[in-house]
Amino acid sequence: MFANAITFLTGISRVSHDYAAASHRRAVMVLLLFALACFLPGFFTLQPMDRDEPRFAQASKQMLETRDFVRIRFQDTARNNKPAGIYWLQSASVSVGQSLGLEDARRTVWLYRLPSLTGALAAVLLTYWAALAFVARGPAVLAAMLLASTILLGVEAHLAKTDAVLLATIVAAMGAFARMYLQSGQSQAEAALPGWRLPLVF
Protein backbone atom coordinates (compact mmCIF):
# COMPACT_ATOMS: atom_id res chain seq x y z
CA MET A 1 0.00 0.00 0.00
CA PHE A 2 2.83 2.37 0.91
CA ALA A 3 4.58 1.56 -2.37
CA ASN A 4 1.38 2.31 -4.29
CA ALA A 5 1.06 5.67 -2.54
CA ILE A 6 4.65 6.54 -3.41
CA THR A 7 4.04 5.55 -7.03
CA PHE A 8 0.88 7.68 -7.16
CA LEU A 9 2.61 10.72 -5.66
CA THR A 10 5.56 10.28 -8.01
CA GLY A 11 3.18 10.20 -10.98
CA ILE A 12 1.38 13.35 -9.80
CA SER A 13 4.71 15.09 -9.31
CA ARG A 14 5.89 14.09 -12.80
CA VAL A 15 2.68 15.32 -14.44
CA SER A 16 2.83 18.60 -12.49
CA HIS A 17 6.48 19.03 -13.41
CA ASP A 18 5.82 18.49 -17.13
CA TYR A 19 2.83 20.85 -17.09
CA ALA A 20 4.74 23.54 -15.18
CA ALA A 21 7.75 23.41 -17.49
CA ALA A 22 5.66 24.71 -20.40
CA SER A 23 5.72 28.37 -19.31
CA HIS A 24 6.75 30.64 -16.45
CA ARG A 25 3.12 31.37 -15.58
CA ARG A 26 2.33 27.68 -15.30
CA ALA A 27 5.49 27.12 -13.29
CA VAL A 28 4.57 29.78 -10.73
CA MET A 29 0.98 28.53 -10.47
CA VAL A 30 2.00 24.89 -10.01
CA LEU A 31 4.71 25.77 -7.49
CA LEU A 32 2.31 27.88 -5.44
CA LEU A 33 -0.34 25.14 -5.40
CA PHE A 34 2.23 22.46 -4.59
CA ALA A 35 3.80 24.54 -1.81
CA LEU A 36 0.40 25.38 -0.31
CA ALA A 37 -0.49 21.68 -0.34
CA CYS A 38 2.72 21.04 1.62
CA PHE A 39 2.44 23.95 4.05
CA LEU A 40 -1.27 24.46 4.80
CA PRO A 41 -2.20 21.21 6.61
CA GLY A 42 -2.35 22.09 10.29
CA PHE A 43 -1.44 25.73 9.74
CA PHE A 44 -4.65 27.09 11.29
CA THR A 45 -5.18 24.42 13.94
CA LEU A 46 -1.79 23.50 15.41
CA GLN A 47 -0.98 24.96 18.79
CA PRO A 48 2.49 26.52 19.32
CA MET A 49 5.04 23.74 18.81
CA ASP A 50 8.30 25.53 19.56
CA ARG A 51 9.28 27.26 22.80
CA ASP A 52 10.35 30.38 20.90
CA GLU A 53 7.13 30.78 18.91
CA PRO A 54 5.06 32.10 21.86
CA ARG A 55 7.86 34.56 22.64
CA PHE A 56 7.82 35.97 19.12
CA ALA A 57 4.03 36.19 19.12
CA GLN A 58 3.88 37.77 22.58
CA ALA A 59 6.55 40.34 21.69
CA SER A 60 4.63 41.29 18.53
CA LYS A 61 1.39 41.45 20.54
CA GLN A 62 3.01 43.80 23.06
CA MET A 63 4.33 45.89 20.18
CA LEU A 64 0.77 46.37 18.96
CA GLU A 65 -0.54 47.10 22.44
CA THR A 66 2.14 49.67 23.33
CA ARG A 67 2.45 51.10 19.79
CA ASP A 68 6.22 51.02 20.34
CA PHE A 69 7.68 49.52 17.15
CA VAL A 70 11.32 50.18 18.06
CA ARG A 71 11.88 48.67 21.49
CA ILE A 72 11.09 44.95 21.35
CA ARG A 73 10.06 43.41 24.66
CA PHE A 74 8.87 40.02 25.88
CA GLN A 75 6.91 40.88 29.00
CA ASP A 76 9.41 43.04 30.95
CA THR A 77 12.56 41.78 29.22
CA ALA A 78 14.20 43.45 26.22
CA ARG A 79 14.31 41.12 23.20
CA ASN A 80 16.96 42.56 20.91
CA ASN A 81 18.56 39.32 19.75
CA LYS A 82 16.33 38.93 16.69
CA PRO A 83 15.75 41.17 13.64
CA ALA A 84 13.01 43.73 14.23
CA GLY A 85 11.53 43.13 10.78
CA ILE A 86 9.82 39.87 11.74
CA TYR A 87 7.98 41.61 14.58
CA TRP A 88 6.87 44.36 12.21
CA LEU A 89 5.59 41.77 9.73
CA GLN A 90 3.73 39.87 12.43
CA SER A 91 2.25 43.09 13.82
CA ALA A 92 1.13 44.10 10.33
CA SER A 93 -0.44 40.68 9.78
CA VAL A 94 -2.42 40.91 13.02
CA SER A 95 -3.43 44.50 12.24
CA VAL A 96 -4.84 43.38 8.89
CA GLY A 97 -6.75 40.62 10.67
CA GLN A 98 -8.18 43.17 13.08
CA SER A 99 -9.18 45.52 10.27
CA LEU A 100 -11.00 42.63 8.57
CA GLY A 101 -13.01 42.07 11.72
CA LEU A 102 -11.38 38.80 12.78
CA GLU A 103 -12.52 38.05 16.32
CA ASP A 104 -9.77 38.14 18.96
CA ALA A 105 -7.11 38.67 16.29
CA ARG A 106 -4.33 39.43 18.78
CA ARG A 107 -4.77 36.01 20.37
CA THR A 108 -5.03 34.09 17.08
CA VAL A 109 -1.67 32.39 16.61
CA TRP A 110 -1.98 31.66 12.88
CA LEU A 111 -2.06 35.39 12.13
CA TYR A 112 1.43 35.62 13.60
CA ARG A 113 2.46 32.70 11.37
CA LEU A 114 1.36 34.32 8.10
CA PRO A 115 4.75 36.04 7.50
CA SER A 116 6.44 32.64 7.87
CA LEU A 117 4.02 31.05 5.40
CA THR A 118 4.58 33.93 2.99
CA GLY A 119 8.35 33.62 3.44
CA ALA A 120 8.24 29.89 2.74
CA LEU A 121 6.19 30.44 -0.43
CA ALA A 122 8.58 33.19 -1.50
CA ALA A 123 11.57 30.92 -0.86
CA VAL A 124 10.08 28.27 -3.17
CA LEU A 125 9.42 30.76 -5.99
CA LEU A 126 12.81 32.41 -5.52
CA THR A 127 14.51 29.01 -5.71
CA TYR A 128 12.86 28.55 -9.10
CA TRP A 129 14.08 32.02 -10.14
CA ALA A 130 17.60 31.42 -8.82
CA ALA A 131 17.88 28.05 -10.56
CA LEU A 132 16.90 29.57 -13.91
CA ALA A 133 20.31 31.26 -13.94
CA PHE A 134 21.91 27.83 -14.38
CA VAL A 135 19.36 25.39 -15.77
CA ALA A 136 16.27 25.18 -17.95
CA ARG A 137 12.73 25.69 -16.68
CA GLY A 138 12.05 22.01 -15.98
CA PRO A 139 14.98 21.42 -13.60
CA ALA A 140 14.31 24.81 -11.97
CA VAL A 141 10.74 23.72 -11.21
CA LEU A 142 12.05 20.45 -9.80
CA ALA A 143 14.50 22.29 -7.54
CA ALA A 144 11.71 24.48 -6.17
CA MET A 145 9.42 21.49 -5.64
CA LEU A 146 12.17 19.69 -3.74
CA LEU A 147 12.55 22.68 -1.44
CA ALA A 148 8.79 22.88 -0.87
CA SER A 149 8.67 19.19 0.07
CA THR A 150 11.41 19.37 2.71
CA ILE A 151 10.22 18.65 6.24
CA LEU A 152 12.22 21.48 7.80
CA LEU A 153 10.71 24.19 5.61
CA GLY A 154 7.26 22.74 6.22
CA VAL A 155 7.83 23.02 9.96
CA GLU A 156 9.17 26.57 9.72
CA ALA A 157 6.17 27.63 7.64
CA HIS A 158 4.03 26.67 10.65
CA LEU A 159 6.05 28.68 13.19
CA ALA A 160 5.83 32.39 13.98
CA LYS A 161 9.61 32.80 13.82
CA THR A 162 12.27 34.30 11.57
CA ASP A 163 13.66 31.32 9.67
CA ALA A 164 11.26 31.04 6.71
CA VAL A 165 11.47 34.77 5.96
CA LEU A 166 15.25 34.66 6.41
CA LEU A 167 15.48 31.79 3.93
CA ALA A 168 13.55 33.81 1.34
CA THR A 169 15.97 36.74 1.66
CA ILE A 170 18.99 34.42 1.40
CA VAL A 171 17.66 32.70 -1.74
CA ALA A 172 16.92 36.10 -3.30
CA ALA A 173 20.49 37.24 -2.59
CA MET A 174 21.91 33.99 -3.98
CA GLY A 175 19.86 34.29 -7.16
CA ALA A 176 20.97 37.87 -7.71
CA PHE A 177 24.61 37.02 -6.95
CA ALA A 178 24.50 34.05 -9.33
CA ARG A 179 23.34 36.26 -12.19
CA MET A 180 25.95 38.92 -11.46
CA TYR A 181 28.62 36.22 -11.30
CA LEU A 182 27.57 34.71 -14.62
CA GLN A 183 27.48 38.15 -16.24
CA SER A 184 31.01 38.84 -15.03
CA GLY A 185 32.28 35.89 -17.07
CA GLN A 186 30.82 37.19 -20.34
CA SER A 187 32.74 39.18 -22.88
CA GLN A 188 32.06 42.89 -23.17
CA ALA A 189 30.13 42.27 -26.39
CA GLU A 190 27.87 39.68 -24.72
CA ALA A 191 27.39 41.36 -21.36
CA ALA A 192 24.50 43.74 -20.91
CA LEU A 193 24.96 47.07 -19.26
CA PRO A 194 24.87 46.67 -15.47
CA GLY A 195 21.46 47.59 -14.12
CA TRP A 196 20.21 48.40 -10.64
CA ARG A 197 17.75 45.53 -10.17
CA LEU A 198 20.16 42.72 -9.28
CA PRO A 199 22.27 44.80 -6.86
CA LEU A 200 19.05 46.00 -5.24
CA VAL A 201 17.81 42.42 -4.77
CA PHE A 202 21.21 41.39 -3.41
Residue ranges of predicted features:
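Membrane-integral, polyisoprenol-dependent glycosyltransferases
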Residues: 2-202
